[in-house]
Amino acid sequence: MSISSHDVGRTYPTTDPYLVTAEKIRELATALGDNAPAYRGDDPIAPPTFAMVLASRAWEALFDDEQLDLRLEHMIHTDQSFHWIRPLHEGDEVTAALTITSVRTRGNTDIIGINVSLDHVDGEHLGNATSTLWHTRPEGNA
């Protein structure tokens, strides 16, 4: 079996909470080469792309779903956007839940839209990470 438009709306279980720490914020800012003071100091906020640290944990459920037959080595991440309600702060505990929002098939390529909802453990919605993935099925699986 492989992914199809019938999978649109499929939502995976929420990830375990991730504790945002000043150290992790600084590590990402350093990796990005961004020395903005907002990402350092006593009360740092996370760079907007910190969403991918959280979203990638939710992606694991998608790739582990044997019914979809998605293979990471056949995947290209083609588009990404973030919509934040508020920045992440040190001490935030955040969960992520992935939903398949679209699937289009062209030949042996599946174009998959996903949305990862990012929420504080207290229920506050923090933002979304939206992605488009291109998955090419091996020959014979089209």
Curated annotation (Swiss-Prot):
Protein name, as recorded: UPF0336 protein PPA1896
Domain of life the protein comes from: Bacteria
Pfam families: FAS1_DH_region
Organismal lineage: Bacteria, Bacillati, Actinomycetota, Actinomycetes, Propionibacteriales
Annotated family: Belongs to the UPF0336 family.
CDD domains: R_hydratase_like
